[in-house]
């Protein structure tokens, strides 16, 4: 789950991480009132969307007068902000964050992610803050350092100091001591909130060697949200794909993609293999959709409705391996779904495993124009051919 920058900064404040003062605004008038409350002489007007690269897209701008705040707020609210993370369609700006201006000095990058390979937390840092870290990795990989932290031991002061020195934070004891303190607070924040990503870009060091987090990006582990109702309250459904939100209500794992072949599969691994096979034979998947091991006829019907809600879908591939899941249950769901949505696009079904033969019999006797396939490769080839 993602949250907005201003919400992330609320969390950082709770953990004692220094951030500029700021106030969220949903209207132009609220933006003006926020600037007046904060006081001048400079404000930063920030569009709030769940995507990076806002500055390059015109979503982060300085204002030196209240009239400028009003003008910028009026132009940003409602705009389709396009960044390298939004795609060509952009994302609509519905919220702003009005923040006090900062004395910009040297900018650094800090982030924490979980590294599955080492089974540790990776503390990633760079002296090239304020830039896209992927761009830094490509152009100046030597400017990025990674320190692995054992979650059983935690981030000790010696590791934090090693990171601070490694990215060239200024030598005065005050600055390095503050850097160590901030990193340890960020680590505690990451652990206590069950985050899967915590990114500060940039961490600003001003002319007096004071450090401030000028941006905050969080992702949270969806499997741990049940114990964080305060974080769930931050969720902004308007920033999410409506199809993905609807799918979550039926316990379906759904992610939209850019192709034209809908995929309904049980199991994340099989779903990814299915999409790869479609690509191998020249097709393009329109979605990732895992119905899980406890799918019912109702869930299958809802899955079909969600897939067909995408106008780009020109065909559907159902690929089921019946272990816990019974193939006849899926077949019943597929038949019900076809009738419920009045299916008008090609449908290929491949089923193997538990109750495979009864499932195939149900499909064959349904009277529906379902294309049967025996292997995953056969299924992929058939659906790719059908949508051409």
UniProtKB/Swiss-Prot annotation:
HAMAP family: Succ_CoA_beta (MF_00558). Keywords: ATP-binding, Ligase, Magnesium, Metal-binding, Nucleotide-binding, Tricarboxylic acid cycle. Substrate binds at residues 266, 323-325. ATP binds at residues 46, 53-55, 99, 102, 107. Heterotetramer of two alpha and two beta subunits. It catalyses: succinate + ATP + CoA = succinyl-CoA + ADP + phosphate; GTP + succinate + CoA = succinyl-CoA + GDP + phosphate. Its EC number is 6.2.1.5. Residues 9-246 form the ATP-grasp domain. Pfam families: ATP-grasp_2, Ligase_CoA. Mg(2+) binds at residues 201, 215. Its cofactor is Mg(2+). One of its GO terms (molecular function) is magnesium ion binding. This is Succinate--CoA ligase [ADP-forming] subunit beta. Succinyl-CoA synthetase functions in the citric acid cycle (TCA), coupling the hydrolysis of succinyl-CoA to the synthesis of either ATP or GTP and thus represents the only step of substrate-level phosphorylation in the TCA. The beta subunit provides nucleotide specificity of the enzyme and binds the substrate succinate, while the binding sites for coenzyme A and phosphate are found in the alpha subunit. Pathway: Carbohydrate metabolism; tricarboxylic acid cycle; succinate from succinyl-CoA (ligase route): step 1/1. Gene3D superfamilies: ATP-grasp fold, A domain (3.30.1490.20), ATP-grasp fold, B domain (3.30.470.20), Succinyl-CoA synthetase domains (3.40.50.261). GO terms for biological process: succinyl-CoA metabolic process; tricarboxylic acid cycle. Binds 1 Mg(2+) ion per subunit. Belongs to the succinate/malate CoA ligase beta subunit family.
């Amino acid at each position: 789950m993602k949250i907005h920058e201003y919400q992330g900064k609320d969390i950082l404040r709770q953990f004692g991480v220094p951030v500029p003062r700021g106030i969220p605004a949903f209207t132009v008038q609220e933006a003006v009132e926020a600037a007046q409350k904060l006081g001048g002489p400079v404000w930063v007007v920030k569009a709030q969307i769940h995507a990076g690269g806002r500055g390059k897209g015109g979503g982060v701008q300085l204002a030196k007068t209240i009239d400028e705040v009003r003008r910028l707020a009026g132009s940003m609210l409602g705009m389709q902000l396009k960044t390298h993370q939004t795609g060509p369609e952009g994302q609509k700006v519905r919220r702003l964050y009005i923040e006090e201006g900062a004395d910009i000095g040297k900018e650094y990058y800090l982030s924490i992610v979980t590294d599955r390979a080492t089974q540790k937390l990776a503390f990633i840092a760079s002296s090239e803050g304020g830039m896209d870290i992927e761009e830094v990795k490509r152009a100046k990989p030597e400017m990025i350092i990674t320190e692995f932290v054992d979650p059983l031991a935690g981030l000790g002061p010696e590791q934090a100091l090693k990171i601070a020195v490694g990215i060239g934070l200024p030598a005065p004891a005050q600055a390095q001591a503050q850097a160590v303190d901030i990193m340890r607070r960020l680590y505690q924040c990451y652990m206590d909130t069950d985050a899967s990503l915590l990114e500060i870009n940039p961490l600003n060091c001003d002319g007096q060697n004071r450090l401030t987090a000028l941006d905050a990006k969080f992702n949270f582990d969806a499997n741990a949200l049940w114990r964080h109702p305060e974080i769930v309250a931050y969720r902004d459904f308007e920033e999410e794909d409506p199809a993905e939100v609807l799918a979550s209500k039926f316990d379906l794992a759904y992610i939209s993609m850019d192709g034209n072949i809908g995929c309904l599969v049980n199991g994340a691994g099989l779903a990814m293999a299915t999409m790869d096979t479609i690509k191998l034979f020249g097709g393009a998947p329109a979605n990732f959709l895992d119905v899980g091991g406890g799918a019912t006829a109702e869930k299958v019907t809802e899955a079909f409705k969600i897939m067909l809600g995408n106008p780009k879908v020109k065909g559907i591939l159902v690929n089921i391996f019946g272990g816990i899941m019974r193939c006849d249950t899926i077949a019943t769901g597929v038949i019900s779904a076809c009738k419920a949505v009045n299916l008008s696009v090609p449908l290929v079904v491949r089923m193997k495993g538990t109750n495979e033969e009864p499932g195939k019999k149900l499909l064959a006797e349904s009277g529906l124009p379902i294309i049967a396939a025996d292997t995953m490769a056969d299924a992929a080839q058939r659906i790719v051919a059908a949508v051409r």
